[in-house]
């Protein structure tokens, strides 16, 4: 086992990364090894997908499968070895299918098939124990490679994982694109070649950022076409009397299915975590039994799910051990999510969830409502832009802070609460992702009717923030980096990595990240990123605010 992809990975003077028998996320060594093998086989699939495309052979089923299966290897997504073995075997079958198609096309054209990369040539083991042994050749730190090269490879690999997750979210909303899929395969295949070319690896990281910008646009289009444009909405965040289902993850389509299937059954539906933004979409306001948001970010689920008196559905990341809070018998997984012993739902029938919710007590009384305001996504931001611009011009708004990303449980993450609460009263705070839960229930007031706290949405709604920044830069006839805008990104896993790469690929500079730098980035790489982009780690709130606001 070697895993260094998330913020909670082990860091010691002897070296960084989770190894031995179990990772800090709870992932067992065998599970980690199977994920490595899955990635390796997927790189082989992509290698053949690239070659097949040279003959105009595009297999949409495979284009769908590869990013979805890759998504299963993100932090806190799939811990179920049996499901991972199925993914590995399916990937191997798809690789064989593309290989046959490619070689047949070569024969028809009278050309010799090219020599393929090691992942494309792998002869897959036939049993789980043999696969785990075989996984050694698929480990991300395989071979004798300089730590800077390894760090760049991992930056690309983990960034592409984040993009794969967003591709799957977009696909669920019927948003696919052959060009995007082709570019994804090219990068995936390249990473399977174990390049030692620093310039090529760095350029690839920027290419991943550009790819993800396209994917976020697709996802934005899919969500708004399906559910309308989010609009400023007040949301209740406490218990409502009645039977209950809690929906966590990111999948709006699953939420819609659950709402339709629970109509008239006396069940209240709550969102959790990154599903909170759903409550701002017009289409979801048709359902009076979608009553609010319960709980906070992913790392608190073992307490929050244990206290929730109903059924829980995990539509995507993040899941952590449900046995700790003794709710494994009433949590259900969907799509790429998996935990051993937890009921996994295949297809669109949520009857088991409904039956479980009806059998449980539900909330026995209403709590006094606590309302927060959400829904400041792209359309709402664009509508507010003229008023925002006027307030900047008249001096009422002097600075913008974008504070968001992934949440986590380290004590140092109080930084993100403090920078939001200590930001000057003449500043506006934009937030997105589950990092918002560090401060989204606090009161920030308004500036001439413009709320000081604007909740943009999910982590992928970084796209909305980028559109606002572009609109402001055009209005003020300046570059984005010349705007009074400071980005403070809380990172935990691979989606945050690809959002960062997206911003860097667009030329956005002087971003602060925290609470700690990614362990896979060496001091040399961090210095390069600082020199090239002004990327830096958070320090103290007081020092960072002085620097941001140019206070002597």
UniProtKB/Swiss-Prot annotation:
NCBIfam families referenced in this protein's UniProt entry, alphabetically: hybrid_clust, PRK05290.1
SUPFAM superfamilies the record matches: Prismane protein-like
PANTHER family: HYDROXYLAMINE REDUCTASE
Protein name in UniProt: Hydroxylamine reductase
Textual note on the cofactor: Binds 1 [2Fe-2S] cluster. Binds 1 hybrid [4Fe-2O-2S] cluster.
GO CC list: cytoplasm
Similarity annotation: Belongs to the HCP family.
């Amino acid at each position: 086992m070697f895993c260094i992809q998330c913020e909670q990975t082990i860091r010691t003077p002897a070296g960084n990364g989770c190894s031995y028998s179990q990772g800090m996320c709870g992932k067992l060594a065998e599970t980690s090894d199977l994920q490595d093998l899955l990635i390796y086989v997927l790189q082989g699939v992509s290698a053949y997908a690239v070659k097949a495309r040279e003959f105009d052979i595009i297999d949409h089923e495979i284009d769908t499968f590869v990013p979805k299966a890759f998504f299963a290897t993100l932090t806190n997504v799939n811990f179920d070895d049996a499901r991972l073995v199925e993914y590995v075997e399916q990937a191997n079958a798809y690789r064989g299918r593309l290989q046959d198609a490619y070689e047949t096309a070569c024969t028809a054209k009278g050309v010799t098939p090219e020599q393929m990369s090691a992942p494309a040539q792998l002869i897959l083991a036939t049993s789980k124990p043999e696969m785990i042994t075989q996984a050694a050749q698929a480990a991300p730190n395989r071979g004798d490679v300089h730590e800077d090269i390894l760090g760049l490879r991992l930056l690309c690999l983990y960034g592409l994982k984040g993009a794969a997750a967003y591709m799957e979210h977009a696909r669920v909303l019927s948003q696919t694109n052959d060009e995007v899929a082709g570019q994804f395969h090219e990068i995936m295949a390249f990473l399977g070649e174990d390049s030692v070319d620093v310039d090529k690896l760095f350029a690839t990281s920027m290419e991943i950022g550009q790819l993800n910008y396209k994917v976020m646009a697709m996802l934005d289009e899919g969500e708004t076409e399906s559910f309308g444009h989010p609009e400023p909405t007040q949301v209740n965040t406490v218990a409502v009397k009645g039977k209950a289902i809690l929906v966590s993850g990111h999948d709006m389509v699953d939420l819609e299915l659950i709402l339709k299937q629970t109509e008239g059954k006396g069940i209240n539906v709550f969102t959790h975590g990154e599903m909170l933004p759903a409550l701002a979409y017009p289409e979801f306001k048709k359902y009076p039994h979608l009553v609010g948001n319960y709980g906070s970010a992913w790392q608190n689920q073992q307490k929050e799910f244990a206290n929730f008196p109903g059924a829980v559905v995990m539509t995507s990341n993040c899941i952590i051990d449900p046995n700790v809070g003794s709710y494994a018998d009433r949590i259900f997984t969907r799509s790429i999510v998996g935990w051993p012993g937890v009921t996994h739902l295949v297809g669109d029938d949520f009857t088991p969830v409904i039956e479980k919710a009806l059998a449980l007590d539900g909330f026995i009384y209403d709590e006094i409502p606590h309302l927060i305001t959400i829904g400041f996504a792209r359309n709402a931001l664009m509508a507010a832009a003229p008023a925002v611009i006027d307030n900047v011009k008249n001096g009422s708004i002097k600075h913008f802070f974008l504070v968001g990303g992934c949440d986590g449980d380290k004590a140092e993450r109080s930084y993100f609460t403090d920078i939001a609460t200590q930001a000057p009263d003449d500043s506006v705070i934009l937030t997105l992702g589950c990092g918002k839960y560090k401060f989204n229930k606090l009161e920030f007031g308004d500036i001439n009717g413009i709320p000081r706290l604007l909740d943009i949405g999910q982590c992928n709604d970084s796209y909305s923030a980028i559109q606002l920044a572009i609109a402001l830069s055009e209005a003020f006839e300046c570059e984005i980096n010349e705007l009074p805008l400071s980005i403070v990104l809380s990172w935990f896993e691979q989606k945050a990595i690809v959002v960062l790469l997206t911003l860097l690929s667009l030329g956005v500079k002087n971003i602060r990240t925290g609470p700690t730098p990614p362990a896979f980035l060496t001091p040399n790489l961090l210095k390069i990123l600082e020199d090239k982009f002004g990327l830096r780690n958070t320090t103290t709130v007081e020092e960072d605010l002085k620097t941001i606001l140019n206070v002597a």
